Structure formats: structure tokens, C-alpha cells
Amino acid sequence: FLKPLGFNNTYALAVRKDTAEKYNLKSISDLSGISQEFLMGPTIEFANREDGLLGLNKAYNLNFKDVKPVDGGLRYTALMNKESDVIDAFTTDGLLDKFGLEVLEDDKNFFPPYYAAPLIRMDTLKEHPELEEVLNLLANKITDKTMRKLNYEVDVNGRDPETVANEFLVSEGYID
């Protein structure tokens, strides 16, 4: 691994803005005493992971009214259609911005970090040692917010990932 890029694409819980305002939700702990009023609409994978819903319920003492796992892409639609009140997401997901969702702070640091870092084969690095210096120029330069914006361009606006990445690198002065 080379140096991390700076963003953490970890799990998060998200709610609609109206729900966050009505219940004054800012952190996952805020759900603790009232989770029984909410429908949880997690992805199937998140629902069955110890570092997902299973462990989260224990760590935060959550007891949702109902848990209805859904396909990953459908969880946002279900949330916006009020078929669920809380969903899991990734912190760099562009759909969070598309739907104007409130991401609840993981105030107990339950979710493990998922830092992005370039991975390169040693034989490739020996053949092209300049790659390490070039790739490390991006170390700690891409925030969660920036990555979410880039993902938004791809996932919401349907833009080509390579084009979006190239535009970012040009705008930040890494390439011409």
C-alpha cells in the first residue's frame, strides 16, 4: 500500500432531513431511546454483518420497530417513499447528496475505517519506481466530501468515471 488518499469510505446511517429535524437526530446515539419508532431499511449485506446492523444494534442499544433488508440500489428509493426511516450508506456515496439526506455521526466510532490507498505490485514498483512519488502526491488530498462530490457526478449525473477523475486531477493541478 502507498499513502492513504484521505477519504474514509466507511458505513454510515442516513435519514431524511424531515426525520432528522423532527427528532433532532445528529448522531446514532440520538436513535438509542427512540429506535423502536423507526423502520430500518438496510442492504441485505449490512443487515447480516457483525460490523453492520448486528453489532450496531448492540453497540448503540438500538431496537428498530422493523428491519426490512432491501437491494442496495433500492434503499434510497424506499427511504424517500417512506417505506423505511433509516438506511445504511457509505460516507462517500453521491446519492446522499442527491436525496439531501442527513448522515448521523457515528459518535461511538463503531464502524471500522475504510481508508482508500493505492495498491501496487512490488515488481511493478521496482520497474517504475517513479510511480510511488507520483501516486503519493494524492496522499490526504481527497476528503470524504470531495469523494462524495465525484461519486455524485458518476452515480447521479451519469458521467464517465475516467472523465470525472481526469477533470479532478486537472482542477487540482496534478495534470495538464
Where are these regions (language model features)?
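A conserved helix-loop-strand patch within extracytoplasmic ligand-binding domains
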Residues: 1-41, 140-144
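Short Pro/Gly-enriched coil loops immediately N-terminal to beta-strands
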Residues: 4-12, 106-116
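A bilobed periplasmic-binding-protein/Venus flytrap-type ligand-binding module shared by bacterial periplasmic
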Residues: 10-21, 115-128
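A local structural motif
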Residues: 36-39, 57-70
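Short helices/loops that flank or line small-molecule/ion binding pockets
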Residues: 54-59, 72-87
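An extracytoplasmic/periplasmic, membrane-proximal ligand-sensing/linker region
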Residues: 57-62, 129-176
